[in-house]
Amino acid sequence: MGRRGLYSAIASVLTAAACALAASATPNPPHLADKSPSAIAVDVELVIAVDVSYSMDPDEQAPQREGYIMALTSREFMQALREGANSKIAITYFEWAGQFDQKIIMPWRLIEGPESADAVANEIAAAPYRRASRTSISGGLTFAKTLFDHSGYHGLRRVIDVSGDGANNAGPLVVPTRDDVLVAGITINGLPIMLKRPYPGTMDMENLDVYYEDCVIGGPGAFVVPIRERAKFIEATRTKLVLEVAGRQPEPRVIPASSQAPRISCTIGEKMWQDRWGGRGLDFQ
């Protein structure tokens, strides 16, 4: 799809999103019951959870971050923002690796126009890059869930946007962790990064997109946007963020993970770690 075709597709999605938001938004969603009356009303509270495990090499880390930075300053993002019921979103950005290794790069910020979007993009861009051991998607999801508790915002929707290039291999099992997040009324979307060809003895896997679909994502409108080519990295990240702000999902629809039997073992990451290291450091519950 060319750039013009992509813009046309996104514009169509945003038009549909405006109608959907007007029809489906309620003044007091259930998850807002415990929020302070002084909290600011926004269309979505969005947590961006970014994998920085050692399997993420610099050629993956840089476009991963750049994709979010460019998305926040794009005209498609601004259009999605304007179409919302409140024309505002709240966003925070953190990096994750092992079970207890999470670092907030940018705390909760309000985006309500180009100026605040630029400020957020600049804040993310200014953070130094880092890498760390292990891949605990479950640890990242658990941490992300807690961030909503004191965000200071009333979101009509709450979304975790998790990106990574491997399966869970540390901390609690990912499925019960995911289900715990979904019970709280939070949607999980995925950005599986599939740039490397899997080789024996590595932690890379061929069907990471299927793993994300069946074991990681869930909730109303949950979807994945796989990245298989470096040239598509920024475009895919931008499209995903625009869809999340608009409250829509791409076609064909991905059925939320909780409503279908997994097509892949959701403990494959733990199994791969055990095969490689003989169970050393395998601390999942």
Enumerate the language-model features and the residues they cover.
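Von Willebrand factor
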Residues: I40-P107, S116-S163, G190-M203, N207, ...
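DG-centered beta-turn motif at the end of beta-strands
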Residues: D51-V52, A144, L156-A170, V216
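VWA/integrin I-like adhesion module and closely mimicked acidic/polar interface patches used
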Residues: L81, A167-D214
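Von Willebrand factor A/integrin I-like adhesion domains
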Residues: I193-E251
